[in-house]
Design a protein with these regions (language model features):
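Short helix-capping and inter-helix turn/linker motifs at the boundaries of alpha-helical repeat units
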Residues: 5-7, 89-90, 247
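Generic start-of-chain signal for non-secretory N-termini
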Residues: 1-18, 460-461
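Iron-sulfur cluster-binding electron-transfer modules in prokaryotic oxidoreductases
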Residues: 120-461
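Non-heme iron-sulfur electron-transfer modules
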Residues: 1-2, 27-101, 115-146, 439-451
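Short regulatory "switch" loops immediately downstream of catalytic or recognition motifs
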Residues: 35-39, 110-116, 305-307, 456
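Residue-level marker of regulatory loop/turn positions in helix-turn-helix DNA-binding domains and
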Residues: 11, 91, 218
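Cysteine-centered iron-sulfur cluster-binding motifs in ferredoxin-type domains/subunits
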Residues: 11-32, 94-116, 156-160, 228, ...
């Protein structure tokens, strides 16, 4: 039934109908306003047809009813119910616009009162509905070239590590960006993350570590973004962990596969994920925990998407139960009284942007908690999505709505005075920097912790 389009439409109607009646998620992402507006406009279309057919007179503005004598035009007012938009009134384009505008921030999951795990008969999972719709459409039409390109982050990282400075230079040439927009669907004005030739994996191979009696041992899941674009974050995470007596290893790994889920490429996702499952599960079996040092999307994928979209087994369950976001793991150490909190430097007041995919993991604000360990630190929560979501915000057709979401987040940040801005998500930081023309350039809680310890930028000691 999963792949049956009729079954999909039936479930789509059910979930859309619940959302229309609730509208609690009206301000979370462009998908919900598109749904609500389309249904409301469908009602307007029904009214216009009735007026054209002479079945009713020209509709009175709703506000005018309040000024009429009691009972007058009561029949006109009651007939408005007939012109209320319904899910079944949506056109095919309107139905699928809701799908396309969902960028899987998953903020609706903790907000919605009807999601699985909550005691309600509706059992509504909007993000999974959208993924199912994308998967069925992809199965029918095939995977678009730009979706295939944007999903293969490991390939992009390898090319970038070989020709980083040259590619970074080419990305600034206007005529080439126009060509990339036509060929790859990357918006010409999207500032792309810079590639680094000395990747995190190269650095780790030459990194010397000597912890004779570790308090714990972890596998570093570096993520494709940290490996190719944000090496400083990966290095800082390792140096902090080793400073606190944690043994770190970096075994063979590849992109978690999350970019393949966006267009519903389940085969690509499984092909990408299986080697990680085989490798990581073996280390978990040997007593290692998995610490993710990149965007929270990756820890969310290992924890929740692997169990949901791969055939569940002991290996996947072990990975899910033993995966930590880096800030989450440091708070775990702190609760075990194994985290050094003798910091040399203060960082002041922080505007902390809450990552959507950390919220989706429903584990609290661990990045904020890490920052608050540093003496005299005040943290302001910025609880709004940046609108990036990896490939979605890079695409030509979604760049503008992506930036509109980001601008709202920047406005929230600028309302609060702070010494620095932080986000657990490197991609969100990249987005906010562009949306603010460089005025907002978020750091990462781990980088700020690294500074607070007084570590050298190069050696960590």
């Amino acid at each position: 039934m999963y792949w049956d389009k009729g079954s999909l439409y039936k479930e789509m109607d059910r979930i859309y109908d619940v959302c229309i009646g609730c509208r609690l998620c009206f301000n979370l992402c462009p998908s919900f306003p598109a749904l609500f507006d389309s249904v409301d406009h469908a009602g307007d279309r029904k009214r216009e047809v009735a007026i054209a057919e002479g079945r009713v007179g020209k509709a009175i503005d709703r506000s005018d009813y309040l000024d009429l004598p009691e009972g007058e035009h009561a029949s006109d007012a009651s007939i408005e119910v007939e012109f209320r938009g319904e899910v079944t009134d949506l056109t095919e384009d309107e139905r699928w616009e809701v799908v396309d505008l969902c960028y899987q921030c998953k903020l609706c999951d903790p907000v919605c009162p009807y999601t699985p795990g909550k005691d309600h008969e509706f059992q509504l999972d909007f993000p999974k509905l959208i993924t199912r719709a994308q998967a069925i459409r992809t199965k029918e039409r095939g995977i678009k070239f730009n979706d295939r390109f944007l999903a293969n982050m490991d390939f992009a990282g390898k090319i970038g590590s070989l020709f980083g400075p040259f590619i970074n230079f080419l990305n600034k040439i206007k005529i080439l960006r126009i060509f990339m927009e036509k060929l790859l669907g990357l918006h010409r004005h999207r500032i792309l993350p810079k590639f680094q030739t000395n990747t995190f994996s190269k650095w780790f191979k030459t990194h010397e570590s000597n912890i004779p009696d570790p308090i714990d041992k972890v596998v570093i899941f570096g993520t494709c973004f940290t490996n190719a674009h944000d090496v400083a974050l990966g290095k800082a995470a390792v140096e902090i962990l080793e400073h606190n007596g944690v043994e770190c290893i970096y075994p063979k790994q590849q992109c978690c596969g999350a970019p393949y889920l966006s267009p519903g490429d389940f085969k690509g996702f499984e092909k990408q994920a299986r080697p990680n499952v085989d490798e990581l599960s073996q280390w978990v079996k040997d007593g290692y925990k998995i610490v993710v040092t990149g965007p929270p999307t990756c820890s969310l994928t290992l924890k929740k998407e692997y169990p949901d979209y791969l055939e569940m087994n002991e290996k996947i369950q072990a990975i899910s139960e033993n995966t930590f976001d880096i800030s989450e793991y440091l708070i775990y150490l702190h609760k075990q009284e194994n985290l050094d909190t003798n910091f040399k430097n203060e960082i002041g007041t922080v505007n902390y942007h809450v990552s959507c995919h950390l919220k989706a993991q429903q584990m609290g604000f661990k990045g904020r908690d890490v920052l608050k360990l540093i003496q005299n630190t005040k943290v302001n929560l910025i609880n709004r999505c940046s609108g990036m979501d990896g490939g979605w915000g890079m695409k030509t057709e979604f760049f503008e709505p992506s930036m509109k979401v980001a601008e709202q987040c920047v406005n929230d940040i600028n309302k609060r005075d702070a010494d620095i801005v932080c986000s657990d998500c490197s991609l969100a930081s990249h987005q906010l920097k562009q949306a603010s023309d460089g005025d907002v350039a978020p750091s990462h809680p781990i980088l700020e912790l690294h500074k607070a310890y007084g570590f050298s930028q190069n050696t960590g000691k």
